[in-house]
């Protein structure tokens, strides 16, 4: 098992798993010049190269450790939009009701605003969805995992008949 948010580079994660799972792979890697663990990507002065078609922006990568939990629900994680993982919702969600419920919590490093969107593919394709647009404001304080767990709980309480977990294949 790995933590949802671990702070390892891909090479470090590979070395860890190779050792802990006794895989025995002969790993080789090239250290990245100028990399500093205490820095965020924009501080390296290099362009953002999406690690996935669903993470086209650095901001999406910041909220991904929490928002990826939505893949296990029948909530849209924003796939089929230009800002996956920064957007989330479902047709039955009233954005302001959700935002009001979330105001009971304190979330540093993140501003959520009510939003309507229409995914072009994936969950709720071609349907108007109510939800939130997430704006990371301070990456060093942001805990997207905590936010998403609270948001899922709020949605399940506010719309218990509509909210559902995805069934395994």
Placement of each model-derived feature along the sequence:
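Hydrophobic alpha-helical scaffolding
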Residues: 3-7, 88, 141
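Electropositive phosphate-/nucleotide-binding environments in soluble metabolic enzymes
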Residues: 7, 11, 81, 145
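Alpha-helical scaffold segments in soluble metabolic enzymes
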Residues: 12-16, 86, 101
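Short gly/pro-enriched beta-turn/loop segments at secondary-structure junctions
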Residues: 22, 78-82, 127-129
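Structured core elements
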Residues: 28-29, 86, 133
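Conserved functional hotspot residues or short segments at active or partner-binding sites
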Residues: 89-169
């Amino acid at each position: 098992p790995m933590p949802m948010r671990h702070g390892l580079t891909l090479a470090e994660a590979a070395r860890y798993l190779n050792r802990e799972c006794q895989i025995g792979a002969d790993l080789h890697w090239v250290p990245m010049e100028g990399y500093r663990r205490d820095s965020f990507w924009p501080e390296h002065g290099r362009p953002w190269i999406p690690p996935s078609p669903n993470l086209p922006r650095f901001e999406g990568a910041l909220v991904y450790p929490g928002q990826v939990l939505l893949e296990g629900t029948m909530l849209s994680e924003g796939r089929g939009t230009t800002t996956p993982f920064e957007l989330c919702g479902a047709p039955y969600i009233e954005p302001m009701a959700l935002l009001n419920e979330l105001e009971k919590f304190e979330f540093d490093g993140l501003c959520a605003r009510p939003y309507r969107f229409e995914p072009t593919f994936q969950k709720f394709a071609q349907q108007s969805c109510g939800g939130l647009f997430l704006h990371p404001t301070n990456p060093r304080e942001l805990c997207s995992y905590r936010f998403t767990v609270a948001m899922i709980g709020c949605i399940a309480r506010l719309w218990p008949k509509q909210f559902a977990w995805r069934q395994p294949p």
